[in-house]
């Protein structure tokens, strides 16, 4: 599948993932689709980045992170006027029903269990969330 053909895309996506193999794979897929991508490997640095401009158009957020987990980040984002409507996709290995329910309750726009989706399917979900937020 081909994403964002044609005009250059300036859409910024922040990817928060501490596994360098996974972050590298998604960074490549997103860049090949024309997105600008910032990769951050720990939750505390991600939180600090999200307090600055420009805000990304989408946050792809792992849950299990060093220093501050993705659930905490999501909960804090939804409390702040500046970031309460920021689209967030949780991209995680946590696949138990209580984890999914918690992510949805905290306000995730989508919840993707890494082992259940191919990178192409994740890209489709990214496109869907970005389209819905415009």
Name each model-derived stretch.
Residues 17:
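Conserved acidic carboxylate
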Residues 66, 84, 96:
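The feature encodes the CheY-like receiver
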Residues 39-58:
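Acidic, metal-coordinating helix/loop segments flanking the phosphotransfer/catalytic sites
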Residues 62, 92:
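Active-site residues of response regulator receiver
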Residues 24-32:
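Charged docking surfaces used in two-component/phosphorelay signaling
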